[in-house]
Amino acid sequence: MDNLINNYVSFISENKTERLCTKNSIRIAQEYGYRDINSVDKLKAGDKVYYDKMGKSMILFNIGSDDISKGMNILGAHIDSPRLDAKQNPIYEDKLYKTGIVYLNTHYYGGIKKYQWVASPLAIYGVVVKADGTKVDIAIGDDPEDPVFCISDILPHIAQEQMKKPASDFIEGEKLDAVLACYPNVKNYKNPEEGKYEPGDGKKNVLKYLEEKYGITEDDFASAELELVPAGKARFIGFDKTLVLGYGQDDRVCAYTSLIAMVEGAAGARTNCCILADKEEIGSNGATGMNSHLLDNAVAEVVARLDVKGNPELAVRRALANSYMLSSDVNSAFDPLNAGLYDIYNSSFLGRGVVFNKYTGARGKSGASDANPEFIAKVRGKLYESEVYFQNAELSKVDTGGGGTIAHYAAEFGMNVLDCGVSVLSMHAPWEITSAFDIEQAYKCYKAFLLLA
């Protein structure tokens, strides 16, 4: 399993956006014989295809020998993570105080503690699409030769008023702007005769640099998707190196293990399916999220290429309604430093295997998909047979908070769904903690589940 863990650490280090996750998941799938469904006219048992949605989410299918109307075994994870997104007009210079500092103006994405994102090195990833359709990929901050970016904070010596505010307010979302550059007053201290920078020159110089290096202009940011993420690679924690520290482990720890379980699995009686979805952190809305027709459209494309008897629309509906799904998403690990937030009898712990969440939601299970015990028993039986370690848990104590996954969107099709993922400490922080043992068990769990009859 060492290769699995090392490959996982590399994957989350190199794929910090949903676009990169999709691009490299497709590459991995192709290495295992998966083809773009748009390149295939007919499908039969044993065929392996993927459905790419706008380069930001994807679904893989391994066609089984049974009629697809009998249902599929589905693994469903998400590949987006909390971050800071650049605004549409993102670059500005401090002209009021004439400091020469140039900033990237951002809007946070997903549920974050804003104070965790200041005074730390950040990288910029994304794509800029020019008016002629040319795409320019941006990746700055993780190469050793790259600069990084940073959001400044107030020194504690003068932060008395700031520190009186609640944690949700003492760093304002509107002030989560990263320093891009700082131009001094004098252009050349060794030769003052070269003149001084005037207000606005700093922004002009940044834009000039971007045009020379990337061929993009300020207007091109209107059609850009740029993300500020933590700079640096994932690392092992502790003397025993049993824990992994990395950005975006919610939910790429489940996405990667689901992907590898899927591509390594052989075709069985039931068709296997693996969803790597976007937009979960903001409610799964949008064309690349699960709160769209992402899944049923993909299944319809598969059914259209199969020799299905009868009404194809009914075949799609039956295929979905008769499916089994693991919503592969993470759960909050018990934190002994904050034990009062957890029901210790119903918590998940690092290093004890994958986690079953029968339900998620908030308060009175609002927004939950409550799994059926008959289905849970079926999954349990398979995991016992495959010697997979698992535990049962909730997110926290009742009324302490809550959360959701993509489970209820899949359940709308009438299928059986169970949340099953990896425990995470410091969830939604720039750097999250998982257990290498749990990652191994997730892989084993997902591989076993795909064999469910």
Locations of regions flagged by a protein language model:
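N-terminal hydrophobic/helix-forming segments and targeting peptides
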Residues: 1-453
